[in-house]
């Protein structure tokens, strides 16, 4: 009984939570429970991976704080509260690259778009700030540019294994 309790405690009471209470299909709930409860280590990041996650998270937070301070009241569709999106996208792209993916297209709503453009796609701070100042410079094929968060962007992303996607 102690082993079962320890296993369940380690699975469900750690630093990462799982929200499956809203799932209504029994087979889907069973799938998640089996995956969660059969794994000894759900996530085991190396020190290098942890540093990259922290760096990406920090970039996202600092960018949001700066925009919120510099452009008070400006419509920017902040990612505040959802900054983990940035290291998550970084992880998804890195994992995809390891499986042979060579190109990624990101389509998303306005919320967090500027942060993704800068911290995932590599759009420069200068380009974003120029757009805030009304100096829209860029490729006209990357969106109509009527507002800063409609502008598109294309780049090469460098993965943690120095691959370009």
Q: How would you name each of these model-derived features?
A:
Residues 1-85, 101:
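Extended, charge-enriched "interface" segments that sit outside catalytic cores
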Residues 52-64, 85-98, 140-159:
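Structured alpha-helical segments in the cores of large, soluble enzyme domains
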